């Protein structure tokens, strides 16, 4: 993938960049693997805002992705690499020998026509999926399960990868993109390789409207609100807030830890950061 720059024909175009989409081979998705997405505008069933800064955006069709990779020992061929509006990574359409077709997250350096397989003793090759117990220490992996058979939940964004660091008893130690070191049950499945589209992080949006196309609404700073709307609001002229930075509900922010204790904390070997 490469980054395309535009001539500065307008202020919004001046610093705007986008993908060249050279790795995408078709713009026609597999109809049998499409679903609908209903927009909520960030509201729940009472009509109250539960997710701020959400609303609008271009209409999308959902692509059903095979995160479980439970189709064991059936070889499949990469039929196409496609754009998915619902995620930063590209997706690959896999055509299996029994005739079934499924989408998977497209790994880096996987091309149309290559064969992949999911199984206990699959080759150590990008796109193949297998339990952590059969993956060599030091391998780069993505789409990692946290519970056996639940499907991959970790490391699915464009350009990300984890590294299998060690195996001890029933658990494998995996270094996540955040830097966190985590123990994961050794029978959980993962996919070999790095997620593709690793230039995604270098894309410059360029203008506010392009963010609105993505379904994101503006974020208003607390210090420019009125006192009724935010703890840091009010004051004559441009005031600095008068208190430590906080959320609209008074919870400290900008570095304050808000993560609650969980029963799964025991699986974290080393915190991120």
UniProtKB/Swiss-Prot annotation:
Keywords attached to this entry: Ribonucleoprotein, Ribosomal protein, RNA-binding, rRNA-binding
Top-rank taxon, per record: Bacteria
GO cellular component term, pick one: large ribosomal subunit
One Gene Ontology term of the molecular function aspect: rRNA binding
GO terms for biological process, alphabetical: cytoplasmic translation
InterPro entries assigned to the protein according to its UniProt record, in alphabetical order: NA-bd_OB-fold, Rib_uL2_dom2, Ribosomal_uL2, Ribosomal_uL2_bac/org-type, Ribosomal_uL2_C, Ribosomal_uL2_CS, Ribosomal_uL2_dom3, Ribosomal_uL2_RNA-bd_dom
SMART domains membership: Ribosomal_L2, Ribosomal_L2_C
Biased composition (Basic and acidic residues): 262-273
Family: Belongs to the universal ribosomal protein uL2 family.
Role of this protein: One of the primary rRNA binding proteins. Required for association of the 30S and 50S subunits to form the 70S ribosome, for tRNA binding and peptide bond formation. It has been suggested to have peptidyltransferase activity; this is somewhat controversial. Makes several contacts with the 16S rRNA in the 70S ribosome.
Subunit structure as annotated in this protein's UniProt entry: Part of the 50S ribosomal subunit. Forms a bridge to the 30S subunit in the 70S ribosome.
UniProt-recorded name of the protein: Large ribosomal subunit protein uL2
Lineage: Bacteria, Pseudomonadati, Thermodesulfobacteriota, Syntrophia, Syntrophales
């Amino acid at each position: 993938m490469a980054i395309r720059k535009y001539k500065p024909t307008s202020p919004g175009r001046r610093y705007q960049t986008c993908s060249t989409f050279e790795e995408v081979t078709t713009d026609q998705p597999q109809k049998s693997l499409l679903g609908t997405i209903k927009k909520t505008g960030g509201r729940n069933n009472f009509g109250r805002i539960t997710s701020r800064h959400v609303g609008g955006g271009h209409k999308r069709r959902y692509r059903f992705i095979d995160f479980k990779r439970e189709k064991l020992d059936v070889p499949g061929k990469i039929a196409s690499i496609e754009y998915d509006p619902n995620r930063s990574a590209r997706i690959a359409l896999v055509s299996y020998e029994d005739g079934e077709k499924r989408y998977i997250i497209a790994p880096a350096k996987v091309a149309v026509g290559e064969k992949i397989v999911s199984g206990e003793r699959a080759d150590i090759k990008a796109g193949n999926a297998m339990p952590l117990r059969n993956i060599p220490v030091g391998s780069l992996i993505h789409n990692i399960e946290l519970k056996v058979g639940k499907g991959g939940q970790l490391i699915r964004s464009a350009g990300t990868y984890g590294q299998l660091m060690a195996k001890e008893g029933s658990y494998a130690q995996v270094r996540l993109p955040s830097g966190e070191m985590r123990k994961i049950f050794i029978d959980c499945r993962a996919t070999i390789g790095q997620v593709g589209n690793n230039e995604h992080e270098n894309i410059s949006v360029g203008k506010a409207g392009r963010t609105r196309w993505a379904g994101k609404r503006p974020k208003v700073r607390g210090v420019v609100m009125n006192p009724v709307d935010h703890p840091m609001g009010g004051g004559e002229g441009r005031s600095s807030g008068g208190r430590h930075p906080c959320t609209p509900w008074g919870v400290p922010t900008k570095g304050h830890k808000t993560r609650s204790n969980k029963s799964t904390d025991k699986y974290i070997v080393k915190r991120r950061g």
